[in-house]
Amino acid sequence: MDDRPIVFFDIAIGGQLAGRVAFRLYSDLVPKTAENFRALCTGEKGLGQSGKPLWYKGSAFHRVIKGFMCQGGDFTAGNGTGGESIYGEKFEDEGFPVHHSRPFLLSMANAGPNTNGSQFFITVSATPHLDGKHVVFGEVIKGRSVVRTIENNPATNGDVPKEPVVIADCGQLSSDDPFLAERTSTDGDPYEDYPDDEDQELGNPETVLQIAKTIREVANRLYKQGDISGALQKYSKSIRYLDVHQELPENSPPDLNEQYKSLLAPLLLNSALAAIRIEPHSAANAMNAVANTSRALNRLELSNADKAKAYYRRGLAKTIMRDEVGAEQDLKTANELLPEDGAIAAELAKIIQKKKEQREREKKAYKKMFA
């Protein structure tokens, strides 16, 4: 198994590097399929029949279904209708020695029997209904959190990621590459990015609460150090752990529910703040901020000060999303809750002035039309 080839993807989401994923390929079980993927990672085969490089670099994940899989590899059309193998357009199913029994397996996408090209998918859960239909040819050995980030990136109704998920770079790694070395936590957070991948038993809500608190402390420290992007990742992670127990068991201690809520409120508000502070602004981060502030407002009992924070931050996020009407409504509500806050008043004045200038431009345009 040590001589199984290892390849990597460097993933960018919305133009920002999300991290590296490394795969070990089952060259001993399905050598032809594994070699196809390996060569498409290195780009060593040059141009294909389509006239485009036989290379995954620059191609995108065009289909992502949360709880199921992340699909990519169409470097010719980019939408799931194209792709090409190193052997020609299509090649046969080599065999089905490995079942889709767990997350983080690499499998060939196809259009029916013996139609393998370059498209692949990464499982994010067990998918036994695909056994005998799709060839499993590898597994993720590093970067599981990056795969989860792809999975949880917002998608359209057609399962297309709203923010492009691109293979910014790819290639082959030696078995002694530093990226593959075991890493210990250097920031005080030893936990997996997603609870489903955590080895520790999470059935006890008090255990999960303590994990979430630990991660929040790391997030706060990163924020104070100016690592806003890192802080957002940790705030989001802490929320994911709390969400393991959205409904607490009936026999839970009486104050445990309050402890959960008192931790969740600042996590939601702080994650929103971090999301709108990251430069350059992105629609994905703005949507994150809107979702978390809305959750805090709709599901938690907040003080007036925290309500004002939530409306203010949601208003800023809506401004980033160019939803000026929604932004003005939220900023007005925040201003009513906290009229002495200068920052809220300034943002509200700014958006009102912008609306006034827009009306003036429209008036001038109409005058020119009928002059």
Swiss-Prot record:
GO BP term, example: protein folding
Keywords assigned by UniProt, alphabetized: Cytoplasm, Isomerase, Repeat, Rotamase, TPR repeat
SS bond partners: none
Compositionally biased tracts (Acidic residues): 189-201
Reaction catalyzed: [protein]-peptidylproline (omega=180) = [protein]-peptidylproline (omega=0)
Main location: cytoplasm
EC code(s) of this entry: 5.2.1.8
Pfam families found in the cross-reference section: Pro_isomerase
Gene3D superfamilies linked to this entry: Cyclophilin-like (2.40.100.10), Tetratricopeptide repeat domain (1.25.40.10)
TPR repeat ranges per the UniProt record: 212-245, 265-303, 308-341
PANTHER family: PEPTIDYL-PROLYL CIS-TRANS ISOMERASE, PEPTIDYL-PROLYL CIS-TRANS ISOMERASE D-RELATED
Annotated family: Belongs to the cyclophilin-type PPIase family. PPIase D subfamily.
Stated name of the protein: Peptidyl-prolyl cis-trans isomerase D
Organism: Amanita muscaria
Name of the encoding gene: Cyp40
